[in-house]
């Protein structure tokens, strides 16, 4: 069984691709061979990579968004994601990294102050040490998106806007076992 939070048992990648609603990676431009994760097929599937490929081909800007749950020590899995984001940044992506402190608060039962400290000391510092450029990036906390009123509720506005495009079953296929705290975050 695989969810974003846990892996147990033997991994059936074909089943995983089907369950998570993703597509296997096919031919990619040569520049992707420069990245170990793509070259070694550690990144083996995608959702909408054709949008990135089109933007690169047409020399148009594109963005990548990822998130992290500040639940503990930075580990190999976090490093692999950081390396992937660094690669996209080098290709010209503007990055958005959301710290899922509200989700961690609901699932890990730590204070928001503790979670903020872990996010900065364990994740952000390591991202920068691995080569993430502080330029062309927005690193923010769910609990405190911005002092700018236009951005402060952007997370919830986006979630509300996108929610009409996703069904509960699609959400569950992406995130696995869920509770109200995970849905809300």
How should these model regions be labeled?
Residues 64, 95-100:
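Short beta-strand segments at enzyme active-site cores
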Residues 77-97:
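Histidine-anchored nucleotide/phosphate-binding helix
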Residues 112-185:
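Divalent-metal (Mg2+/Mn2+/Ca2+)-assisted nucleotide/phosphate chemistry catalytic cores
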Residues 1-68, 137:
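Non-catalytic terminal extensions that flank enzyme cores
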Residues 69-79:
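Short, glycine-rich nucleotide/cofactor-binding loops
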Residues 46-56, 86, 125, 182-184:
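Short, charged beta->alpha transition segments
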Residues 98-108:
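Short connector loops at secondary-structure junctions
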Residues 68-70, 101-103, 143-145:
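Active-site-proximal loop/turn and secondary-structure-junction residues that shape catalytic pockets
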């Amino acid at each position: 069984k695989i969810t974003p939070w846990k892996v147990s048992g033997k991994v059936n990648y074909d089943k995983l691709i089907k369950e998570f609603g993703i597509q296997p990676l096919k031919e990619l431009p040569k520049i992707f061979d420069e990245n170990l994760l793509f070259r070694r097929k550690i990144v083996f599937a995608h959702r909408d990579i054709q949008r990135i490929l089109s933007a690169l081909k047409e020399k148009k800007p594109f963005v990548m968004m990822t998130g992290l749950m500040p639940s503990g020590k930075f580990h190999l899995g976090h490093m692999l994601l950081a390396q992937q984001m660094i690669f996209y940044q080098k290709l010209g992506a503007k990055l958005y990294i959301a710290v899922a402190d509200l989700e961690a608060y609901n699932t890990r039962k730590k204070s928001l102050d503790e979670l903020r400290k872990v996010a900065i000391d364990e994740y952000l510092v390591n991202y920068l040490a691995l080569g993430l450029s502080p330029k062309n990036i927005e690193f923010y906390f769910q609990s405190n998106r911005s002092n700018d009123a236009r951005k402060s509720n952007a997370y919830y506005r986006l979630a509300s806007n996108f929610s009409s495009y996703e069904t509960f079953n699609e959400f569950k296929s992406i995130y696995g076992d869920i509770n109200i705290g995970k849905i809300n975050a």
